[in-house]
């Protein structure tokens, strides 16, 4: 569980903002491992935006990389458009995640980032961040850790799509989502899916009908309870086993 922190609101242009020192998800984000002086320097370059409404985009494919975005609340999906003009979802980003890493190599975003619900983000100008990280080893190391985590996630996704059947894919998706909620201090057993079943199917390479059928099967087996977008994990051992993990949902 992420310990509760006293939230200090300071007036900025545009209203109230939570600073890095007071953010409850800082352990998952860039500020982790930074000392107070380093936090102050990072805090000074961050722009805190107004809420992003459902359906709005942070950036589009082809846009020049100007900033990275740290999600404070809400859910952002990343997707590309195939040669056939179809949407292909490549990731779902939760509070504490950083969006935009995949643009560092070319200097342009290869994908779109769109809010699935009302979300709050911190905008971090990349050139300034890159310059600052050159002067702060702790910041540079944390950036590398975050990028390494994203690469590991991509590798896991390749394995998921190439080696697992439909049941195992969906079980792994729900299991991994529950672990991510746990890391953020939320319940790993009861949560709301912010993405549609169509989005989940798109991400996993399955049809909407297959997702609905499998959720019904998981519920009938007693592994899950499903009510609309709300999921309750009833048998964490069974879910972990089907997902290819041995540890219980914490």
UniProtKB/Swiss-Prot annotation:
Binding of [4Fe-4S] cluster, residues: 20, 23, 29, 122
Q: Which residues bind DNA?
A: 197-216
Note the superkingdom of the native organism.
Bacteria
Where is the segment annotated Activating region 1B?
116-121
What region holds the HTH crp-type domain?
164-237
Q: Where is this region: Activating region 2A?
A: 47-50
What does the UniProt cofactor note say? Answer: Binds 1 [4Fe-4S] cluster per subunit.
Q: Where is this region: Activating region 2C?
A: 127-128
What is this protein's function per UniProt? Global transcription factor that controls the expression of over 100 target genes in response to anoxia. It facilitates the adaptation to anaerobic growth conditions by regulating the expression of gene products that are involved in anaerobic energy metabolism. When the terminal electron acceptor, O(2), is no longer available, it represses the synthesis of enzymes involved in aerobic respiration and increases the synthesis of enzymes required for anaerobic respiration.
- UniProt-annotated stretches for the region Activating region 1A: 71-75
A Pfam family reported for this protein in Swiss-Prot or TrEMBL: HTH_Crp_2
Protein name per UniProt: Fumarate and nitrate reduction regulatory protein
Could you give a GO molecular-function term held by this entry? DNA-binding transcription factor activity
Q: Where is this region: Activating region 3D?
A: 112
Question: Any idea where this protein resides?
Answer: Cytoplasm
Q: Which organism is this entry from? A: Salmonella typhimurium (strain LT2 / SGSC1412 / ATCC 700720)
Q: Name one GO biological process term.
A: positive regulation of DNA-templated transcription
Region of interest called Essential for the oxygen-regulated activity, as start-end residue ranges on this chain: 20-29
